[in-house]
Every structure is written in structure tokens, then in C-alpha cells.
């Protein structure tokens, strides 16, 4: 149904409208955001006594690592006091803005004074760890199309031969369930809401039909893909480039932290696909750096990681972008965790004469893949360092044999075998080559300071690692990801900025240094391993502060974490070495002025806000 000129004039961004008349109403999206905001305000009013630790506050690092004093009884009381609040927080997402500020909650809690001596190692095991009976995680009333046939092929979905050939070149020969369900409806122009586990091929589910439609009728800017993080934006651009380059498609990646003039020039060149974070794209459009009408012919809008995008913090940018993109367009939402905002959109009765968007969610009893082995390690917070070192230097038996050796060495042997090199190597050299090395590992922390400190700590212990957090410049962040992907270093230490959407092949293990505060954060973190049918291991370190929290995560995700038992005597043999390395890493962080730039920017922001408030008061 065409949008009348009168209604378009009075409400320039009144609706998401697909090519065949399907509508995702923008007003409903905004209502969902406001509902989420009210829930967040209620949470804040209930928990005013909680304090958020700033990422750039290095001086609080010792407190975060559990070095403050207190009684075990006080710790237990604090845990019980916060339990009710945490239960309501389990599925709520914090918005991540354009500058990728991690606003993770890290609650200061009293700690036992004697460390290991004050903690019973059987305390967690004696608790009732059996998950409560839980229905399938599919939200009640969420409409979903029927499961596609197992015989579906890319050709039967309507993709052209050149695109199928491009997929074969990257070893994609058969569509996954989410791809088989969503490619055809998106290809026909329908709006779509798709949900599936991490590593199930959601990106290709919307990328393939977009590329196919552009190849049939290429002109100007056809599609805009919005993501919550910069790293995910670059990854999506790479995937569009791989499948679209043989067809002559062009893309532009528009994110913060990079040269705005260069990005403005890229937009002036009218790429077929724009992959962007909302803040930077809005800045370019508002500043006049891009000529008017550059987005006037956009036909498809995609919100990737839609549960994070449909939060109040992104509402102003999305509202502005809606007004710049034609009202008559196709809209696609994809996510691994279905939030209340998405459920509202899926269940909303469409306007008269309209249909609901096509909705498909991969049904499952759990929110994590079956080939992922999930374990917990229950230890005092003060001795996490030696346990981390031991796990990295002694790969777990659950890790696939193929991932327990250096990927570079394995690939070198494959090349030699392909070339027919059969020369025998000395026995000692062969044993050294086959000896288990540090597996490809992603370590997640709550705070930027913790991530950077662990990175320095591991490097001083001769375990090469790279950091990924918002205190790094964008080129530094891209370099860290590139080195980890190329297997130059075996360990990536990151905050939750690296938990969403990043597809890093051959990650053998994920370690949660800090227990996630929400179950959906847990799902996205552990989803960095066991992708595309591969195996993987996730180890969550649980301290005396997290015993109730892990039970909530088990209930929400519908899994039972298996206890990881290690020889404590062997682990603590490296305690002195690790303690010395931590002191050296702490001094190096202090000398480097870590977080000073962020502290200066924050002070300027506070000063500017006070000045604006004073000016508003005078007016």
C-alpha cells in the first residue's frame, strides 16, 4: 500500500514498509524502547546503593580483583541483598553507544580477609545446582514460520549461479536452518525478524538476499546495515565484500574512531551497501559532510544484534536515521537473544490491510549449541591468576585435538603433506612440534582496566596476547583482531565489546574471568567458540561473590555447568611467578598513563553538561 503524501509530510518516518506492503511500525519500535527505559529506571530506583565502577579507574583495580577486606558473613548478606535485583536483570541489556563505552556493572562487595582459607571449595557443590524446570526459550506467543525442509539448497532458494559459486569458494555449500528459512522471504521483499543461536549463520541469512537483489538491479545506496559495535561492522563489511566482489558490489564501513572526511568521500561515491554504527552515520548526515539525498533510495534496512539496537540509548540516532531513509523500505531484524522489544514487534497486531513481518526463530531447548562443553571453576578471587596460567599452559582434554596445537604448525604440516614432502624429522623435533601449545582462547572481563592488566600479565608470562576494549583507538582494536585471527597470538583479552557477532574461526576456548551479570551476556560470550559445527569449551570462573548468580544463569540458559577440577598443588606451584608478573604489569599500566585520555574526556563532558544546564536555567 502506498504511503500518502499527506501522511508522509506530517510523519516523515512513520513506518518501516516493505516492498510488498508489510509494515514494522516505527511508533511501536519507539514504544518498545520507552518500555525498556522505564524498566531500566525502575531497576535504578531499586538499586541506588549500587555504584558503577568506571572503566578508566585503574586505582580501583585491586578492589575489583578481590583485595579489599571484610567478613565472610558480610559478603553473604550482600549477595542475598542483590539477588532479587539480579533476577530481574538477567535478560536486560545495557545499550552500547557509538563510542563503545562498556557500562558494565561491577558492584563493590566486601571480601574475605584470608583468601583461600575462608572459602570452602565444596560450598558451590553442596548447593542445589539443578536448573529449575524450564520451557523452551522461545517466547510465549512469538509467531514463527514452520521449519524448512532439510533438502533446501541455495539454488532452490532463488540465488543465482555466480553467488552460489562465490559461496562455494569460501566452503559454504548448504544453507543453515536460519538461512533456509529467511533467504527466500527477504529475497521477495518481505520484512523479517530472525532469531538463532550464535554461530548459526544469521549474517548470511540477510546478506545473501541483499546481494542477490542488488545484483539484479544495481543502483546507488541499496542497503543500510546498522550494528552496535565497530568490530562487528567491519566483520559484516568483510563478509559482504567476499560474496559481493565477484558481482561488482561496493561497500562502505562507517564507524567512530576513523577519519570522517574519508568516510564522507566513501558515502559520496554511493556504495551499494553501507555498514555503520548509528552514531557516526548520524554525525556525517547532520554535519553536512554528505550531500542531501544520499539515502533517499535505500530499499533495505537491517538491524543486526537487534536486541542491543532496540534500547533507549540508540533511540535518538535511530529516529533520525528513520527520517533520512524512505518510509517505503524493507526492514530486517536479526539477533541471537530475543528481547521484550523484539517480542513486542513480532506480536503486535498489524494495521488494517497489512501483514505481520516474516518471523523465524530456530527452536531449541537451550540457548547454547550442543557441541559446546560448559564448565565452571570455583576458586577464591585472589588466586585466579595461577589458575588462568595453568589452564592456558595445560589444554583441557575436552578441547578438540586439532585445536590443541599451534594452528600455524598444523597448516604448515598440511602444506608439506600436500606437496609430498615425506622427509623424516628428528624424533625430538617432532615431539616439540606435536606438544600441546596455548589453544586459541578468548578471555572476557567486565572492565577495560582488567582486560589490559591481564594482557600485560600474560605477555610477561611468555603467553602472547592482545587486548580489545574501548580505551584503545580504532586502528589498535582492528590490529588486535587481525593478529588474533591470523594466529599470530593465541589469546585475545576483551571486554563485552568483543562478545557480539564476531566470527573468529578456530577459537578453542572461552574463559569468563568475571562471571557475566546477565544470562544473555553469557550466551553471547560463550558463542565465540563452538561455531559452525566445531567443538569448543567455555570455562566460567566463579568466586565467592558469584554463587547465586551462576544458578540464575543456569536456569535462564537451561544448562547445567560441569565443575572443572584441577590439581590445586600443581596450580599453585606458579603462584610466586604469577604474583611477581602481576606487580610488574600493574606498574607498567601506571607508567603508561592508562585511562588518562578517557578521564580527561569525561571531565570535559561533565563540564559541558553543567554549562548547558546553567544556560538552560537562565533561559
Curated annotation (Swiss-Prot):
Residues annotated as domain Helicase ATP-binding: 183-356
Motif (Q motif): 152-180
GO cellular component entries: cytosol; nucleolus
Primary site of residence: nucleus
Pfam families: DEAD, Helicase_C
Residue ranges occupied by any Helicase C-terminal domain in the UniProt entry: 430-572
List of residues binding ATP: 196-203
Key words of the record: ATP-binding, Helicase, Hydrolase, Nucleotide-binding, Nucleus, Ribosome biogenesis, RNA-binding, rRNA processing
Extent of Acidic residues compositional bias: 46-67, 93-105
CDD domains, alphabetized: DEADc_DDX49, SF2_C_DEAD
Motif (DEAD box): 304-307
Biased composition range(s): Low complexity: 68-78
Compositional bias (Polar residues): 137-147
UniProt entry tagged with the keyword ATP-binding: yes
Reactions listed under catalytic activity: ATP + H2O = ADP + phosphate + H(+)
Region: Disordered, residue numbers: 1-149, 414-436
EC numbers, comma separated: 3.6.4.13
Localisation: Nucleus, Nucleolus
Gene Ontology biological process terms in this record: rRNA processing
Top-level division of the source organism's lineage: Eukaryota
Record note on domains: The Q motif is unique to and characteristic of the DEAD box family of RNA helicases and controls ATP binding and hydrolysis.
Described purpose of this protein according to its UniProt entry: ATP-binding RNA helicase involved in 40S ribosomal subunit biogenesis and is required for the normal formation of 18S rRNAs through pre-rRNA processing at A0, A1 and A2 sites. Required for vegetative growth.
Assigned protein family: Belongs to the DEAD box helicase family. DDX49/DBP8 subfamily.
Name of the molecule in the record: ATP-dependent RNA helicase DBP8
Originating gene: DBP8
Amino acid at each position: 500500500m502506498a504511503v500518502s503524501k499527506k501522511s508522509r509530510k506530517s510523519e516523515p518516518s512513520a513506518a518501516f514498509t516493505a516492498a510488498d506492503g508489510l509494515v514494522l511500525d516505527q511508533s511501536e519500535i519507539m514504544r518498545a524502547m520507552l518500555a525498556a527505559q522505564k524498566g531500566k529506571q525502575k531497576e535504578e530506583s531499586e538499586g541506588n546503593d549500587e555504584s558503577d565502577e568506571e572503566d578508566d579507574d585503574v586505582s580501583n583495580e585491586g578492589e575489583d580483583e578481590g583485595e579489599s577486606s571484610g567478613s565472610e558473613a558480610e559478603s553473604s548478606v550482600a549477595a542475598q541483598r542483590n539477588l532479587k535485583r539480579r533476577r530481574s536483570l538477567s535478560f536486560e541489556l545495557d545499550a552500547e553507544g557509538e563510542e563503545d563505552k562498556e557500562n558494565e556493572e561491577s558492584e563493590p562487595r566486601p571480601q574475605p580477609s584470608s583468601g583461600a582459607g575462608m572459602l570452602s571449595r565444596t560450598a558451590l557443590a553442596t548447593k542445589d545446582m539443578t536448573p529449575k524446570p524450564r520451557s523452551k526459550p522461545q517466547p510465549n506467543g512469538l509467531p514463527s514460520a514452520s521449519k524448512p525442509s532439510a533438502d533446501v539448497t541455495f539454488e532452490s532458494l532463488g540465488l543465482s549461479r555466480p553467488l552460489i559459486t562465490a559461496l562455494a569458494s569460501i566452503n559454504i555449500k548448504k544453507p543453515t536452518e536460519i538461512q533456509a528459512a529467511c533467504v527466500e522471504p527477504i529475497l521477495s521483499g518481505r520484512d523479517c525478524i530472525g532469531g538463532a543461536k550464535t554461530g548459526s549463520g544469521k549474517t548470511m541469512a540477510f546478506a545473501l538476499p541483499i546481494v542477490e537483489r542488488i545484483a539484479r538491479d544495481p543502483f546507488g545506496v541499496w542497503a543500510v546495515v546498522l550494528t552496535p559495535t565497530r568490530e562487528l561492522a567491519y566483520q559484516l563489511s568483510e563478509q559482504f565484500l567476499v560474496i559481493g566482489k565477484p558481482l561488482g558490489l561496493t561497500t562502505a564501513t562507517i564507524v567512530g574512531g576513523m577519519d570522517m572526511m574519508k568516510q564522507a568521500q566513501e558515502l559520496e561515491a554511493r556504495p551499494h551497501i553501507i555498514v555503520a554504527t548509528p552514531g557516526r552515520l548520524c554525525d556525517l548526515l547532520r554535519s553536512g559532510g554528505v550531500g542531501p539525498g544520499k539515502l533517499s533510495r535505500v530499499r533495505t534496512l537491517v538491524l543486526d544484534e537487534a536486541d542491543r539496537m532496540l534500547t533507549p540509548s540508540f533511540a535518538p540516532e535511530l529516529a533520525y536515521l528513520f527520517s533520512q531513509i524512505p518510509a517505503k523500505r524493507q526492514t530486517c531484524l536479526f539477533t541471537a537473544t530475543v528481547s521484550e522489544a523484539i517480542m513486542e514487534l513480532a506480536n503486535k497486531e498489524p494495521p488494517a490491510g497489512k501483514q505481520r513481518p516474516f518471523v523465524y526463530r530456530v527452536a531449541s531447548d537451550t540457548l547454547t549449541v550442543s557441541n559446546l562443553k560448559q564448565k565452571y571453576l570455583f576458586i577464591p578471587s585472589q588466586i585466579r591468576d595461577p589458575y588462568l596460567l595453568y589452564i592456558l599452559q595445560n589444554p583441557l582434554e575436552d578441547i578438540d585435538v586439532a585445536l590443541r596445537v599451534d594452528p600455524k604448525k598444523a597448516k604448515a604440516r598440511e602444506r608439506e603433506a600436500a606437496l609430498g614432502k615425506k622427509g623424516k624429522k628428528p624424533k625430538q623435533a617432532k615431539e616439540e612440534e606435536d606438544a600441546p601449545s596455548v589453544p586459541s582462547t578468548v578471555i572476557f572481563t567486565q572492565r577495560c582496566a582488567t582486560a589490559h592488566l591481564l594482557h600485560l600479565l600474560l605477555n610477561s608470562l611468555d603467553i602472547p596476547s592482545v587486548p580489545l576494549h574501548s580505551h584503545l583507538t580504532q586502528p589498535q582494536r582492528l590490529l588486535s583482531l587481525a593478529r588474533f585471527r591470523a594466529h599470530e597470538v593465541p589469546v585475545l583479552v576483551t571486554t563485552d565489546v568483543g562478545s557480539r557477532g564476531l566470527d573468529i574461526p578456530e577459537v578453542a576456548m572461552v574463559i569468563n574471568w568475571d562471571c557475566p551479570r546477565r544470562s544473555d551476556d553469557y550466551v553471547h560470550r560463550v558463542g565465540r567458540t563452538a561455531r559452525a559445527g566445531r567443538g569448543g569449551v567455555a570455562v566460567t570462573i566463579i568466586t565467592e561473590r558469584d554463587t547465586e548468580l551462576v544458578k540464575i544463569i543456569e536456569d535462564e540458559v537451561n544448562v547445567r555447568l560441569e565443575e572443572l577440577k584441577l590439581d590445586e598443588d600443581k596450580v599453585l606451584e606458579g603462584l610466586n611467578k604469577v604474583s611477581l608478573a602481576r606487580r610488574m604489569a600493574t606498574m607498567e599500566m601506571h607508567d603508561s598513563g592508562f585511562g588518562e585520555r578517557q578521564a580527561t574526556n569525561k571531565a570535559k563532558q561533565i563540564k559541558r553538561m553543567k554549562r548547558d544546564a546553567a544556560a538552560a536555567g537562565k533561559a
